[in-house]
Amino acid sequence: IYLYRNDENRFEIYDLNEDDQMPYVIMNSMSVAEFRGSSQSNVLWTTLDCIKAWNRTRSEFGPIPFRYAFKRIWEGGHGDQSQHYAGVAFDCGQVLSQEERNRLHTIATRLDVWSYVEPLYLTPTWVHFDKRYGQSACSAGYPLLRKGDRGIYVLIMQDALNALGYNTRFLDGDFGE
C-alpha cells in the first residue's frame, strides 16, 4: 500500500495482508481486501486525506457498505480518467435502501470533507464520493503533472505508461527532477 501524505508530500509504504485494516482507518471500517475490491493488483495506493474523509463519514453515518474503491488504470471499468485509479473514490451503498442512500449522500455532502459527491440523479443505485487533490487540469479532476511532482497522480501516469509499453523503471509516485 502506497499511502500519500499530502501534508508532507511523501509516501508511507505498507506491506499488508488482505485481512489487515487499511492504514489509519477507524473502527475496523475498511480492510485491504475491501479497498482492493475487484482489482487484481497487489499494489494499491490512496491518500491520508482520503482516509480521513472516510473516517469522518464513517463516524457520522455508521458502517458504509461499498463495492468499488481502487482500480489500476489498465484494469478499466471506470472510463479513461477516474478517481478510482487514484485510490481516492468510493462507490457505496449499493445494498442500502434508497432512504439510507439519500442519508449517506446528505451526510457526505454536509460534512464537506470530500472534493466531489456525485449528484444522486447520476448514481441512482449507489453514492459516489472522492477526495481528489491539486488544481484540476481536466473535468475528471486530474492535475497537470510536472517534473518534480510526487503523489498518486504520478503513480497513475507511471502505471499508464508501463501499461502502454514504456518502461518508467519505477512505480514510485515520483516524477523526478
Residue ranges and their predicted role:
Residues 1-60, 108, 122, 132-139, ...:
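Extracytoplasmic cell-surface/polysaccharide-interacting catalytic and binding patches
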Residues 2-4, 80-89, 94-165, 173:
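Catalytic cores and adjacent binding grooves of peptidoglycan-active enzymes
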Residues 23, 54, 78-81, 117:
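Short, flexible coil/linker segments at or flanking structured domains
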Residues 41-44, 65-72, 92-95, 101-107:
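Short linear motifs at secondary-structure transitions and domain/linker junctions
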Residues 48-79:
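Extended, low-complexity, intrinsically disordered C-terminal regulatory tails
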Residues 62-70, 115-121, 170-172:
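Surface-exposed patches in mature extracellular/periplasmic domains of secreted proteins
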